[in-house]
Curated annotation (Swiss-Prot):
The lineage of its organism: Archaea, Methanobacteriati, Methanobacteriota, Methanomada group, Methanobacteria. Keywords: Plasmid. This is Uncharacterized protein ORF3'. It comes from the Archaea.
Length: 217
């Protein structure tokens, strides 16, 4: 039995490795073709080591717009971020970024596209002719982000996506499992002595069923 479990774990890990490598290869190909990429349900920091020849600028914060633009320019130039922020307007910073990033294969990397403010989305849209973007998107896009998202290639590992209809079904199945366990247990044991243990066991069974269905989906 232990040997069988080890084999199953190896197969699961192998499958996961193949999925990850396949997605990474798609990201690399898209970037090498000059496209900007949004990866669904991923942490983009896992892709910072891609060998694509880009000048990578990782943005820890993506709002507010002027501060983000100042951070990009500070990375490309010699001025401190605080100096850029206080001395120039957002439009001036954007123009300078465009000038400094020409023919340099600049790649802006950040998480959570869906959190971009309208102003930050507008800044990135202005820069798209001269830089590429690699980001994660881990939620529903907001109003004001549509034009930018249309300029990007969206990639995903389908195993990471759980459609809206699956979640209610899994919750319902778990609830049914709990009720069934409680009903069966009540018929066997004296309720006065086993209520707490029966309820605890039922919750455990329900969670186990839910996790199993979620994993299968």
């Amino acid at each position: 039995m232990k040997k069988l479990n080890n084999i199953i774990m190896i197969l699961i890990m192998h499958r996961y490795f193949l999925r990850v490598m396949n997605l990474r290869q798609k990201v690399i190909e898209a970037l090498e073709e000059g496209k900007s990429v949004a990866i669904k349900y991923q942490d983009v920091r896992d892709y910072l080591d891609l060998k694509t020849g880009h000048r990578v600028i990782f943005l820890e914060h993506i709002n507010p717009a002027k501060e983000t633009a100042a951070e990009i320019l500070a990375d490309l130039g010699n001025l401190a971020k605080s100096t850029i922020y206080s001395k120039y307007t957002t439009n001036e910073i954007v123009r300078d970024i465009k000038k400094r990033s020409k023919n340099r294969n600049v790649l802006l990397v950040f998480n959570d596209f869906q959190l971009l403010s309208k102003n930050t989305a507008r800044v990135l849209l202005d820069l798209m002719e001269d830089v590429q973007v690699l980001c994660s998107i881990r939620g529903r896009p907001q109003k004001g982000q549509g034009r930018l998202l249309k300029r990007m290639t969206i990639l995903s590992d389908r195993s990471d996506e759980v459609t809206d209809i699956k979640i209610p079904l899994i919750v319902f199945a778990s609830f049914i499992a709990i009720l069934t366990f409680v009903k069966a247990g009540s018929a066997i044991y004296n309720r006065n002595h086993f209520d707490f243990y029966l309820f605890s066991a039922a919750i455990f069974v329900g969670i186990s069923v839910g996790r199993t269905l979620l994993w299968i989906s």
